[in-house]
Amino acid sequence: MTIAALSVEAPRKGITLLGTGDCLHTAWQKEIRTCTSIDEGTFELNGTRFILSAEVEDNHRVHHLLYFPSFSAADAYKEAIKTKSKNLETDGRPNVDMNGVELASLAKDVEALIGPAHGFTPWTAIYAYHPSLQSCYGDMTPYISFIELGLSADTDYADTIEELHRLTFLTNSDCHSPHPVRLAREFTRFEVHDATFSEIKKAILRVGGNKPVLNVGLPPQEGKYNESACISCFTHYTLEEAMKRRWKCSCGKRIKKGVKDRIGEIASFKQPRHPPHRPPYVYLIPLSEIIAKALGQHTPFTQSVTKRWDELIAAFGSEITVLLDADLEQVARVTVPAITTAIQAFRDHKVRIVPGGGGKYGTIELPTDDDRAIPVSLGPRNSQTSLLDY
């Protein structure tokens, strides 16, 4: 994982700008500084833009996402937390012995944006530990402008919670590899004048005409913690079954509460109520996963999957184009029939998802009678199928 590798792979996925991640770590800062500086908070390498971002864990194991306007702001934040963290120089996501109020207050001091990371996951998210934003951020709650939804949630899930209606929803994915399966599994499209920190900040705050215009992400059923399930054997349970079992699986291991069940507990409404500013949400499944399923591969990381992925990207430019916009007759000239058929199934909303849970990702299935597979609408709410329409 290097900034250089990310800068090359991002455009092949169709991404213009990435958060650097880990910008409080000295070694990673050196990587970032190999980029050309566009302004204090924006950097570029191989045509890909970067803004300074980091994730920190507080003393309740809640993860917070930060965006910094400059290296000096990031350094000032690092200086403020260094006596409260034992792994600031050894871990990209440091553990900080401070609470959400303190971390948000320090962010405000350096004019950084801060909000909950992967807000609903059962181990290290705000709603795993807290019942509300106020419980976490206290008198700093008005300063919180966004929540990152995480892979196991979407706009429909989150907009059942009234206190989130004022926030901007970010659909990001904290890639641990520049491999196309992991990079930009989710992303947010913004209406901005330029791809810079200041313009992105305005878009997150929804000021000056800047705003998010599209959230793109996995179907939440594909997330590792969508349903309540055992963390060892991955047997799925309803909330009622898990509670009766006192969250202990028949195999003896722990049942972990799923995002769907947790949101059901804290929801204000049974059905989502979207505020006027909320943009559409489009579901995408990584092209590598679709190729793997079409080829009968057990993993999208095989050489044969990568070869077919590379052929399609070479022909059409980016993964998004292949999935949504490329003419299927042209796709058929580039790849094997099974892959063309699978892409057609995706576009026709016929791909099905076996939900994830307990730490195991959900899996996609091509049209099947399997009772465990549930059909998921994989297009925008208004049935437009091209991201270019946004």
PLM feature spans:
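An N-terminally biased module of ancient metal coordination in phosphate/nucleic-acid-related enzymes
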Residues: M1-N59, V351-R352, I364, A373, ...
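Divalent metal-coordination and catalytic microenvironments
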Residues: D22, L66, I114, I147, ...
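Active-site metal-binding loops of divalent metal-dependent hydrolases
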Residues: C23, G119, L151, S173-C175
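Extended substrate/RNA-proximal surfaces in nucleic-acid metabolism proteins
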Residues: Q29-S145
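Short acidic/histidine-rich active-site segments
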Residues: R166-R182
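Cys/His-rich short segments
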Residues: G209-V282
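Low-complexity, acidic/Ser/Thr- and charged residue-rich accessory regions of DNA metabolism proteins
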Residues: I291-Y390
